[in-house]
Amino acid sequence: MLRNTPFGATPTYKLLLGFGLCSLGGAMLYAYFKTRNDEEEADSGGQRPASGIRGQTEEQKPQKEVCLKIVVDNEHVPLIMGRGGSNIKLIEEKTLAKIRLRDKDSGHKFCDISGVPDAVKAARALLIKEIERAPVVKVELQVPQRLASKINGRGGELLQEIRSSSLAKLNIDLNGRNGKAKITIIGNQKQVNIARKMLDDQIEEDEELVRSMEEVEQRREPRRSPTNSIASSMYSSQTSLSSHTQPRDKLMASKGEGKPMEVYVSAVASPTKFWVQLIGPQSKKLDSMVQEMTSYYSSAENRAKHVLTAPYVGQIVAAVFKFDEKWYRAEIVDIMPNQYNPKEQVIDLYFVDYGDSEYISPADICELRTDFLTLRFQAVECFLANVKSTIQTEPITWPKSSIAKFEELTEVAHWRKLIARVVTYKERPRATTAVSAAAKEGTPLPGVELFDPADNSELNIADLMITQGFALPLDDSYPVRSRSSTPSSNSDSTIEELCVSNPVTPLTPHSPMSMSIDVDSITQAENEHLAQQLQHLQHKLNGNDIKNINPAKLTATDLENGNNNNASTTNGASAH
């Protein structure tokens, strides 16, 4: 349009037209290439730009740092640090975590690990690995064999407890010398220290027990004279209604210990009918109780509070023993007329903690103070295994000479320590006058081998009886062993471990591994018998609850009523 005008012929017009055409061409080229690039990116995967954007977003949002605090023993700090801190530096370089140690207490330090979670986790794993490569320590201890047997017994419960608590390896060698066993502890220093501490506690407990037993042996006096022991044991009835129940605390503690038991022979009727006390903490408790009973019942005023006016068979009472003038717990087995004075009565008593019996006048018997029932009865009836009487026609009747020899060898009631091991059992004769559940059930009697630990050897008492002509072997196959025969320390039987669940013949030998006991039935029988005593005493207290009675706060009226009703009250001691 401007081309035909005078302006169209000017150079300015031509310049403007050239710039315009170039600009239009450039714009068209840009639009073309832009469209082509978009189409190519769409064909080759148009999601790539979005991925790139997400990656940039994640990189812009770093992980949050965390700090983990662990506690390490001072003895492990050198392992973590390394020479000049080289270990920590190496771990920090590998994991990009930061590690700092600071004091916690005298024996430990805090180890703070900071960084991103993955780095902290990796650093912790490397630190634990360094701690676990602590040098292995081996320690050997010499302990008494009885303690080693205790640790290794009861299915190894105590041994497993030490292993699990310390994470150390423990091995026990019972075949040591001079009555010692060797315990080997293997682990790092911390594990060994923990195991050693737990073993030291057991050693201290065992030494305390030995000291207590030595004190008992020094303080105990002979309970009866040898000249009187035969008559008393042979001619008193000794058919206790409750003596079949072993002391439950000792039974539960030693069940399955797998070792011979230390015992005192406390009373003897014959080699096939005698009583033992298990040596242990209860021995000292028994002596303390006898001392307290003697002190209490020696007072005429106290005896007046516990007058026995209506005795009954099966009642647990307090009675004075004429030989030593001490007071003991006893059970009334029978009440009968005095053969020298039919108008008077005589009471046949079984001393539940010792096993012997006496005929005693009711005047020398009192009702038992209730708190004296707390300790379990200590006498355990046994028979000597593998022997029989020299009287062929009456194998259960023993000559007085044989009984006297057996009393001499066992030092009955003179508190000589013997070793007993259960090797068999037989059914107990059922008592026709029994009122306790245990007697009605006819619990089995343990047959034991007795050993005298003298002159660094253990003499088998049954063998001595046979070789000296005071007994015969139970059968021809019985081997008379050396006089220094030693009971196996690996035996799994104890005096308490009797099997009452399976039918048996009257005399059934069993391997030590098969000996066990129905604890619940025996415990229930003894509890029922004690409950009967408490029920009787509660009735005497006019229906008052024994548990709620404070003897120190009884009024004069209460005491007067108690005496009128023969109540069994306590003076200055709590009833249980």
Curated annotation (Swiss-Prot):
InterPro entries to which the protein is assigned, alphabetical: KH_dom, KH_dom_type_1, KH_dom_type_1_sf, SNase_OB-fold_sf, TDRD2-like_tudor, Tudor, Tudor_domain_containing
Gene Ontology terms: cellular component: mitochondrion; nucleus; P granule; protein-containing complex
Gene3D superfamilies registered for this protein in UniProt: 2.30.30.140, 2.40.50.90, K Homology domain, type 1 (3.30.1370.10)
A family per Pfam: TUDOR
Region Disordered, residue ranges: 40-60, 209-253, 556-576
Locations listed in the record: Cytoplasm; Nucleus; Cytoplasm, Cytoplasmic ribonucleoprotein granule
Domain Tudor: 310-375
Domain notes: The Tudor domain is sufficient for binding to the N-terminus (1-14) of both unmethylated piwi or piwi symmetrically dimethylated at 'Arg-10'. However, it may not be sufficient for binding to symmetrically dimethylated AGO3, instead this interaction may require a larger region of the C-terminus which includes the Tudor domain (257-576).
Protein name stated in the entry: Tudor and KH domain-containing protein homolog
Source organism of the structure: Drosophila melanogaster
Gene: papi
